[in-house]
Amino acid sequence: MPNKTGDKYGGLAKKLRSGRPVFNGKIQLDYDALEAPLSWRLPRIIFVNSMSDLFHESVPMSFIRRVFDVMNRCPQHTFQVLTKRPERALEVASKLEWAKNIWMGTSVETKEYYERIRLLQQIPAHVRFLSCEPLLGPLPRMPLKGIHWVIVGGESGPGSRPMQGTWVLQIKEQCEKKDVPFFFKQWGGVRKKEAGRELNGQTWDEMPGNQVEQAKNERASNRSKILV
């Protein structure tokens, strides 16, 4: 996710000395940008709200419906919707049309947010994902039933809180056991480019879809090699 406040969201967030944007309580709805995906012919993966939350309590249902209308009219694109408020997403889920190209996710930074996962599991999206970024603690015994993708990443920028490698490996092992695609985004830190995004000497870019079967086959192949 972007670490800085873009011009589009100017006035909606302020920065602390750590460099992290903090929501100032004002909601700005960009109606002009809603139909832009309709003009994009080639397929794209679109992260709907990099610095916002579609299911914030101040966002009117009429606006949410318009966003979903556009997403349903663009089957060529994949829309990733991330929220920290899955309780509202679940509350209005039955009023929305969930096309296969609409992926619904929630943020899980620590185990204290496991209730978000349980709420997400009840939302009728074809793909449900977890964003464990920034990962701020271990996530043991994650409830992964009905979860189709897990993203993990460390916090970046000045004042970023460190992420332990054991936390990342713990999540990866759980994903492997449940055949859930695992995507490792970054180690983060003040110099995130230098820290890179390799885990155990390689990058992990698994995603839902055809790559799920590919990942299963690769794991089965690796297990058979170990047995031999």
Please place each PLM-identified region on the residue numbering.
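Conserved Radical SAM active-site core
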Residues: 1-102, 111-114, 139-144
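Auxiliary Fe-S-binding modules of radical SAM enzymes
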Residues: 4-11, 136, 141-228
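Structural preference for beta-strand elements that scaffold enzyme active sites
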Residues: 45-47, 78-80, 101-105, 127-131, ...
